[in-house]
Amino acid sequence: MELEHPDDLYYLDSHEYVRFDGETATIGLSAFAVDELGDIVFVELPEEGDKVEFEQSMGAVESVKAASDLYSPVTGTVIEKNSALEDQPELLNQDPYGEEGWLIKVRLDDVEDAKEGLMAAGDYRATLETGD
């Protein structure tokens, strides 16, 4: 089965994605990561008002197979978290890129440099294909 990796998103090599909308970034976990983890049973996210830093741990996700840290693809302040995932972590499995499966929304510290260090979708797909 071929996994979807939308072209309008940017990716971190640890498989988090980010969707930019002006000064706001929506962060989630890629379909590849969700598929690798299997059935997700627990999600820990930062609180609104918390600061997240590029490539620093911002939470965790646990599945029936493994536990994994979540890393922030941007630097900024959390303005919203997807609280539905606390009671329904399986939403990540069902819709990682959609209205129900995102993790947090962040107000960016630096809009100009926000994409630095991230991969465009084509580069991310190529990395997955080569296993780098």
UniProtKB/Swiss-Prot annotation:
InterPro entries: 2-oxoA_DH_lipoyl-BS (IPR003016), Biotin_lipoyl (IPR000089), GCV_H (IPR002930), GCV_H/Fam206 (IPR033753), GCV_H_sub (IPR017453), Single_hybrid_motif (IPR011053). It comes from the Bacteria. GO terms for cellular component: glycine cleavage complex. The modification N6-lipoyllysine is found at K65. Pfam families: GCV_H. Residues 24-107 form the Lipoyl-binding domain. Binds 1 lipoyl cofactor covalently. Its cofactor is (R)-lipoate. One of its GO terms (biological process) is glycine decarboxylation via glycine cleavage system. Keywords: Lipoyl. The glycine cleavage system is composed of four proteins: P, T, L and H. Belongs to the GcvH family. The glycine cleavage system catalyzes the degradation of glycine. The H protein shuttles the methylamine group of glycine from the P protein to the T protein. This is Glycine cleavage system H protein. It comes from Synechocystis sp. (strain ATCC 27184 / PCC 6803 / Kazusa).
